[in-house]
Amino acid sequence: QHHGGMQEVIMSTDQAYWQVISLVNKKKLAEGYLKLLQQLDGDVEKMINEGVATKADGLSVRVKVNEAEMTLTKVEDGLSLARMLLCQLCGIDLSSPITLADENMEDIPLLTTDPHFDLSTAYENRPEIRSLELATQIYKQKVNVTRAEHLPSIALMGNYMVTNPSVFNSFENKFKGMWNVGVMVQIPIWHWGEGIYKTRAAKAEARIAQYQLQDAREKIELQVNQAAFKVKEAGKKLVMSSKNMEKAEENLRYATLGFKEGVIATSNVLEAQTAWLSAHSEKIDAQIDVKLTEIYLKKSLGTLK
């Protein structure tokens, strides 16, 4: 029970930790997106003054700038709350300034867990399995004890008694002794029905404990397989999101170049910037998802430390 509670605390703390890392990276992303929009806003303003862009183009960009500022504010507020939650879980004062080890990393270190696993590891480490195995053994012994209480019992007794004077001749002042040997047999004739009932009840309890153990093993096997599947799925999503981000960056680069050359409209640049923001955000989510699925797999195996 202590081991299971400790793993729950570790998992909650890890979740809060990576939530902070996610929001730190999304804050950087929101700041970069806002900077892009502000730069585009300045370029469009110059083009309006030169008569090669309309006020509608300028208004469209300013709306995006305002939206980006609001998004940045929301991310900052969420980051502050996430830091407070992490402090609370770690027993630190909520107002304490903390800097996490992975905050300044460009790419989060990933795939430290092998998705291949041995179910025997989970059976050995999961506390609920150990508890149910112990309960099964106890109920099996209870059957033996209950059966023994209602089986015939035989007792052999013997003693040797020495007296002076002798019990055979009271006038003889000598030590004389004799042996006493007896056999006692106890057969539960009147309570045999009660014994059968109690034995059957004990066997039923033992079978229930065995079924509970089997059910727990099956559920843990399902849980571990689901966690391993999610690890693999998260890895695939990360690969796809990385490719998508590369394409979005290339698209934004061509859109920005075309805009400066005057062959691409402002709306196309805004679309490219939005796609760039979405691709980066998806990659951050995919990286964090990989870390969290690794944690869930370790917990399902009982190896989370």
List the predicted regions and their residue ranges.
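Hydrophobic, lipid-facing positions within transmembrane beta-strands of outer-membrane proteins
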Residues: D118, W179-V185
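Short cytosolic juxtamembrane segments of multi-pass membrane proteins
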Residues: P152, K299-K305
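Periplasmic alpha-helical coiled-coil/stalk elements that build and connect Gram-negative outer-membrane
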Residues: H2, E8-T121, A227-K230, A234, ...
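Amphipathic alpha-helical coiled-coil segments
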Residues: G5-K28, K46, A82, S131-T146, ...
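Small/polar (Gly/Ser/Thr/Ala-rich) solvent-exposed segments
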Residues: Q1-G4, R130, K140, E149-W179, ...
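Metallo-beta-lactamase
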Residues: V75, P127, A209, A286
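Acidic, glycine-rich loop-and-beta core segments that form the ion-binding/anion-interacting portion
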Residues: I108-P109, D114-A155, N159
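Residues on the lipid-exposed face of transmembrane beta-strands in outer-membrane beta-barrel proteins
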Residues: L86, V183-I187, A286, L297
